[in-house]
Regions:
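Accessory "access/gating" subregions that flank catalytic or transport cores
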Residues: 1-2, 315
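Asp/Glu-rich intrinsically disordered low-complexity tracts
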Residues: 3, 8-45, 790
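Patatin-like phospholipase A catalytic core
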Residues: 44-807
Length: 807
């Protein structure tokens, strides 16, 4: 099996022994150090400490802020080799990196970046409701979403006009009875309309040969498939005959659809939606015609219903946010909304499935049928009609060829909102005072500028800040590239390398006819393609100035937090793809494939509009010019996998991924993935050490636990796991807030509009958990300002606070 990049399967760049293979110097197997010069494992000369911060939106960002503050105070952060972060965790991790790298050096004297009480900490806290911090922000968000939706509707409308209108003209030429007489005008009396033949029945002619051909093709395919099943010819002839049978049935169905079903649908449309003489013939002489005008209105009604259903689905999706808003209006409204939400769980699922899988495509099909019907009404296209079609065709071509499919998605706005909150530096003002200010958005903060040696104050053996790894995922749909249900690979933005460090198996490229006629050979003939990564600085150079803005630090963080998109790795919901793509609910980004960087001097300027159609159908090919990159949580939501890939000896994991406070599925998924992909074993049991006290008040027995890491070569390490849990030893103010807020410490990720009080509670909890993790790393207590409390005392605190809240 050869290497798609020109190397041998065992000795090429992507092979096991090649430089990028698992056993090569840059690989992730036992023979490599995980990231070439960045390695920190047994072959590296650094501390071997890695820190990872989980995803979870602003909840995780606040928790990670407190955790990193404690780790920094204990000296663990600056000693670490890698800081891996996902989604919300990357908000804070990138903020730490940007402040450390781009602040005025004199402003940092005497106080570490993001130390408690620092100006940048206050900045982030004051802007923690980063998406909609004001009515102006909300209006802008709605406006951007509306413009994106309009752009999508314009594209689909132009595409339908370009394809369906000429097909209608063809039907008018082939079936004269579909034409509408010029004497059938709007407002004509019934007698005149009858006399002019406006309601004459349609006689579809010449269908016999076409239907005979369609039936013959389909019957031949079925008989061939039956013969293959009964007589079992040898392999691979069996697969070829099955494919031929499938092709015959498909061609027969297509002939029947275009020759008979589609003309009948046109007539059916006129019958059902009709009512005016200017629409021409129908199937029965009932005096009821079909109206292009009324038909358009009815089809518009269908589209309106689809839009209303879409809105309903989105409303029930954000029901939690609406409930929280209702709380501020009164306890009665809040309780009523809560009961409504309890009843809407099933309706939510039905609405999502109905809108995504039925109404959206049906509305689009209805629009296509309306355009097709209009083209079938005239003997010849009118001049205005031809001009309109030409405009639509030019618009479709221009959008397909020149438009940037990322430009009108929600990603640019999301990236900007994150940047203005978390891309902050400490500066010396004109008055000599120290303050925090956002880094100008137009300034490109390159990932390649974050290598540890580039940080101010760095000295050999005395690092200032670890290497930042922003963890996202690249969606892939090639069969056999990933296990079923995963549909993505890790995609990491690092200062030295970007992408996925492994090669993958993909079918060899063959001519279409060979793929069609010889499926057995083509499916088994695979090649190694990759690795899907490249040097970050080379990647930034090759992608060009326009695309370079898509791989800045803020862009990487936005992609790491791109939680909603048509393709979402293991979280993909196929029925929702159409809905999300059509309504422009797209946070993912099409990035140039890093695997192509060594062979390219440049890449296409834009990911073209055709990729919106790829999003609709979930087409994400590994060999594509662009990869669709989304939330890191779509493959692994802790960042733990990337630290194990780099063979860290001591790993601190800060988990605020949310979910239940009594289960640890996020950690379990990460450990399972590390075992299957890296052959790294982790022995840990958080369920026992962090068990719930089962008093109904969200109190757990602990918040940190330690496990053992075993690498393939037998080298061992430590996993120190800290989770956002309230325990009897948590600070009293955290326990009091938990009594007040029934969702704490697992506020739903859909709530990104934190108040300062909620942000402070998660930060304080993170600071407490981070301190406990730091003590395990250093082996010495660093002090705990909160007095330990017994489980019963903690329960009493919660009970008293809840009693006061409901009094």
């Amino acid at each position: 099996m050869g290497d798609a990049r020109g190397g041998d399967a065992h000795g090429g760049p992507g092979g096991p022994s090649g430089p990028n293979g698992p056993n090569g110097p840059n690989g992730d197997g036992p023979g490599g150090d995980g990231d070439g010069p960045d390695g920190d494992g047994p072959n590296g000369d650094r501390s071997g400490i890695g820190i990872c911060c989980s995803g979870g939106g602003i909840r995780s960002a606040a928790f990670a802020l407190g955790g990193l503050q404690s780790l920094d105070a204990a000296g663990v952060l600056r000693r670490a080799d890698h800081l891996a972060a996902v989604s919300g965790g990357s908000y804070t991790a990138s903020a730490y990196a940007i402040t450390s790298r781009y602040s005025d050096p004199e402003a940092l004297e005497g106080q570490r970046p993001f130390a408690p009480g620092s100006p940048e900490e206050a900045w982030v806290r004051n802007h923690c409701s980063y998406l909609t911090n004001s009515a102006r922000d909300t209006l802008r968000l709605v406006g951007v979403a509306a413009i994106g939706l309009l752009a999508n509707l314009v594209f689909f409308t132009a595409l339908l006009w370009t394809v369906a209108r000429p097909l209608g003209w063809l039907y008018a030429w082939w079936q004269p009875d579909l034409r509408v007489s010029g004497e059938c005008t709007a407002g004509a009396s019934p007698e005149t309309a009858w006399g002019n033949g406006c309601y004459a029945p349609v006689g579809l002619t010449g269908l016999g040969p076409w239907l005979l051909a369609a039936g013959g093709l389909a019957l031949g395919g079925l008989l061939l498939a039956l013969g293959v099943r009964m007589f079992q010819p040898g392999w691979p002839l069996r697969q070829t005959l099955r494919r031929v049978a499938l092709v015959l049935v498909a061609v027969g169905a297509a002939v029947a659809f275009f020759a008979w079903a589609l003309p009948e649908l046109i007539v059916f449309t006129r019958n059902v939606l009709g009512g005016e003489p200017e629409t021409g013939p129908v199937t029965e002489s009932t005096g009821v015609g079909s109206s292009s005008d009324k038909g358009g209105a009815n089809l518009g009604f269908i589209a309106t219903v689809g839009g209303a259903a879409t809105l309903a689905a989105l409303v029930v999706q954000v029901g939690g946010t609406l409930r929280r808003a209702a709380v501020t209006g009164g306890r009665v409204v809040a309780r009523a909304t809560t009961r409504l939400e309890r009843l809407s769980g099933g309706l939510r699922r039905v609405a999502n499935t109905l809108v995504g899988a039925v109404i959206g495509p049906l509305a689009l099909a209805a629009g296509a049928l309306f355009i097709l019907n209009g083209g079938a009404q005239g003997a010849h296209p009118r001049t205005g009609e031809l001009l309109l079609w030409a405009v639509m065709a030019l618009l479709t071509g221009a959008m397909l060829w020149f438009a940037d499919v990322t430009a009108w998605s929600l990603h640019p706005l999301y990236k900007w909102r994150l940047s203005r909150t978390f891309a902050v530096a400490r500066v010396v003002g004109e008055d000599g005072g120290v303050t925090a200010a956002p880094v100008p958005y137009e300034r490109l903060l390159h990932m390649s500028d974050l290598t540890p040696e580039q940080f101010p104050g760095h000295r050999p053996g005395a690092p200032v800040f670890p290497e930042l790894l922003v963890c996202a995922s690249a969606n892939v749909s090639d069969q056999g590239t990933t296990p079923p249900g995963r549909s993505s690979v890790s995609f990491v933005f690092g200062p030295r390398r970007i992408g996925y460090p492994r090669a993958v198996d993909v079918p060899r490229k063959v001519p279409w006819w060979r793929w069609l006629l010889y499926p057995a050979q083509t499916e088994q003939d695979t090649v190694r393609f990759g690795p899907l990564e490249g040097p970050t600085r080379d990647y930034e150079r090759v992608v060009g100035e326009r695309r370079r803005r898509d791989i800045t630090i803020s862009a990487a963080v936005a992609m790491s937090g791109a939680a909603v998109a048509p393709s979402m790795g293991k979280m993909t919901r196929a029925p929702l793809r159409f809905l999300l793509a059509l309504t422009n609910v797209r946070l993912g980004v099409w990035l140039p494939n890093p695997a192509n960087v060594p062979q390219s001097s440049s890449v296409p300027v834009n990911p073209r509009q055709i990729r919106l159609l790829y999003e609709v159908v979930g087409r994400n090919r590994v060999r594509s010019t662009f990869l669709y990159v989304t939330d890191g949580g779509h493959i692994e939501n802790l960042g733990l996998l990337e630290l194990l890939r780099r063979r860290c000896r001591t790993v601190v994991c800060l988990d605020a991924a949310g979910g239940s406070t009594t289960s640890f599925s996020t950690l379990g998924e990460a450990i399972s993935l590390a075992a299957s992909e890296l052959d790294v074993r982790v022995d840990i049991d958080p369920a026992e050490a962090l068990r719930s006290l089962d008093d109904g008040r969200r109190i757990n027995d602990g918040d940190t636990v330690e496990g053992t890491i075993t690498y393939p070569d037998g080298t061992t390490g430590r996993l120190i796991y800290g989770k956002a849990l309230v325990t009897p030893r948590s600070p009293w103010d955290v326990r009091a807030y938990a009594a007040k807020d029934g969702r704490f410490p697992a506020t739903p990720t859909g709530d990104q509009a934190f108040s300062g009080e909620t942000f402070d509670a998660y930060q304080a909890l993170g600071r407490h958990v981070g301190r406990a993790c730091a003590e395990r790393v250093t082996g010495a207590a660093t002090g705990n300002p909160s007095a330990a409390a017994s489980p019963s005392a903690a329960a009493d605190v919660v009970l008293r606070a809840e009693t006061q809240a409901t009094a």
